[in-house]
UniProtKB/Swiss-Prot annotation:
Sequence ranges on the Cytoplasmic membrane side: 85-92
Protein name: Transmembrane protein 256
Segments passing through the bilayer: 64-84, 93-113
Organism of this sequence: Mus musculus (Mouse)
Extracellular topological intervals: 30-63
UniProt similarity note: Belongs to the TMEM256 family.
Gene that this polypeptide is encoded by: Tmem256
Length: 113
């Protein structure tokens, strides 16, 4: 299991780097369709950072595979739906947000137990 934990730690670090890159893009280069788009982007970025940090803790939990998969997939679905809507104004994939959020909750529970 040490290899699995190390893989999720690496994924968390890469995700954090990606979150920082997106934060820079959102602050300096992005063209948002409206003020709500900027707010949505910032919300996605905050969650992206937070859950990247959570992935760094996966190797320390009792069920690293479950916790890592739930956190990684939840972060992807939740943040991607927000980033996409923020940048495009298209709401067609916003239903992925609650699915991703539910996976994130389960991921945090997997970290705890």
């Amino acid at each position: 299991m040490a290899g699995v934990g190390a893989a999720f730690r690496r994924l968390g670090a890469l995700s954090g780097a990606g979150a920082l890159g997106l934060a820079s893009y959102g602050a300096h280069g992005a063209q948002f369709p409206d003020a709500y788009g900027k707010e949505l982007f910032d919300k996605a970025n905050k969650h992206h950072f937070l859950h990247s940090l959570a992935l760094l803790g996966v190797p320390s939990c009792r069920k690293p595979v479950w916790a890592g998969l739930l956190l990684a997939s939840g972060t992807t679905l939740f943040c991607t739906s927000f980033y996409y809507q923020a940048l495009s104004g298209d709401t067609s994939i916003q239903t992925l947000g609650p699915v991703g959020g539910s996976l994130l909750i389960l991921g945090w529970l997997a970290l705890a137990f």
